[in-house]
Structure formats: C-alpha cells, structure tokens
Amino acid sequence: MKLNTSPYPVQLEVVLDWDTFVKKYKKAKGIEPEEQSKGVTTLLPDGSVLIYAQDSDPITLVHELNHFCIYTFGFIGLPINDDNSEAYCYYMDSLLKQTLKVIK
C-alpha cells in the first residue's frame, strides 16, 4: 500500500507479505534482500522507501515507520528534538493510521 506522505516530498510503500517485498526489492535494486526478518525499511534507488512488516504486526509497523520518519526528517533537514517532536509525532500518527486502516 502506498501511503500519503504529505506534506513531505518523499514516497513510501508498505508491503505486508515477504514474496511481494522480495519482488519489489529485486525489481528496484537488482538483487534479492537479505534473509527475512520481522521487518525491513529500505531506501530504493529512485529515492522512495519500501517497508516490509511480517504478519502486519503493529509493533513491527511502529518500529519500521519510525525508521521512515527519521529518514524523512533527515531528508528535509528538520532535526528530531523537543522543538520538533510534535511534528514528528503527528507525522507518525498519520502514517500508522493509514496502515492500520488497511490491515484491520
């Protein structure tokens, strides 16, 4: 599922089954991903991000989405600190809500 990542100029797709993740990863990078783990967040050559979360596990989703949020804030040059924590938390909330809507 492709998520709405506005207002930031990044692209994110979340994949919930390993076979689909491997197919998309291999198409983008030309190689197979390393051995399966519960979750993976990877930057693709086109600048987009692909996330895999095994069994739609909410804890894994939160973990992997945090990787994406950290990447996004670094990409736009916004440090993650007390001054910007609200922006970070609202962004994380938005991404998690979109994902949970689909898996429920």
Locate predicted features.
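Post-HExxH zinc-binding segment in Zn-dependent metallohydrolases
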Residues: P79-K104
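Catalytic zinc-binding patch centered on the HExxH motif and its immediate surroundings
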Residues: M1-N4, D17-G47
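Short pre-active-site segment immediately N-terminal to the catalytic Zn-binding motif
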Residues: P45-L61
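Substrate-binding clefts and substrate-entry loops adjacent to catalytic sites
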Residues: Y71-P79
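Surface-exposed, interaction-prone regions used to assemble/regulate multi-protein complexes
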Residues: V10-L12
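Active-site recognition of the HExxH zinc-binding catalytic motif
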Residues: I59-Y71
